[in-house]
């Protein structure tokens, strides 16, 4: 059975595909997750994260942007956007504790992104979590 960490990794891959222009990913997300052995409770968890990010993507991007300081959101890599969006969604709209979310995103950054990305993700998501002290926003 897949772990929540594996489910989050699969969601990041789906979000990356979506950001890269594959809008069809929404229709086949469930079957793609099942191919990755994400099933039962973890499948429901992964789909809730994926669909939640897509439903609130503009709101999530607006939450992230003020914390980028000298960065332009549009110039971030697709993988960085995917991980930040997942982290921001979980911080803002789920009951999962912020340190757990941030740590998971750092680990995803180590796995999927450039070597300096985990520090970048940590800084942005930590800043965001401090601003959003009340959970959840929805």
UniProtKB/Swiss-Prot annotation:
InterPro entries, per database record: NusB-like_sf, NusB_fam, NusB_RsmB_TIM44
SUPFAM superfamilies from the UniProt entry: NusB-like
Gene Ontology CC: cytosol
GO molecular function: RNA binding
Disulfide bonds: none
One Pfam short name: NusB
GO biological process entries: DNA-templated transcription termination; transcription antitermination
Keywords: RNA-binding, Transcription, Transcription antitermination, Transcription regulation
Function: Involved in transcription antitermination. Required for transcription of ribosomal RNA (rRNA) genes. Binds specifically to the boxA antiterminator sequence of the ribosomal RNA (rrn) operons.
PANTHER family to which the protein is assigned, alphabetical: ANTITERMINATION NUSB DOMAIN-CONTAINING PROTEIN, N UTILIZATION SUBSTANCE PROTEIN B-RELATED
Recorded family membership: Belongs to the NusB family.
Protein name: Transcription antitermination protein NusB
Organism of derivation: Helicobacter pylori (strain P12)
């Amino acid at each position: 059975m897949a772990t929540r960490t594996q489910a989050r990794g699969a969601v990041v891959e789906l979000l990356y595909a979506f950001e890269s222009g594959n809008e069809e990913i929404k229709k086949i997300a469930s079957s793609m997750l099942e191919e990755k052995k994400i099933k039962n409770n973890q499948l429901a968890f992964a789909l809730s994260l994926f669909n939640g990010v897509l439903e609130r993507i503009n709101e999530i991007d607006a939450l992230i942007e003020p914390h980028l300081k000298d960065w332009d959101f549009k110039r971030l890599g697709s993988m960085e956007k995917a991980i930040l969006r997942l982290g921001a969604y979980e911080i803002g709209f789920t009951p999962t504790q912020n340190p757990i979310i941030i740590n998971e995103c750092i680990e995803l950054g180590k796995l999927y992104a450039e070597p300096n990305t985990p520090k970048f993700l940590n800084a942005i998501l930590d800043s965001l979590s401090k601003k959003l002290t009340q959970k959840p926003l929805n």
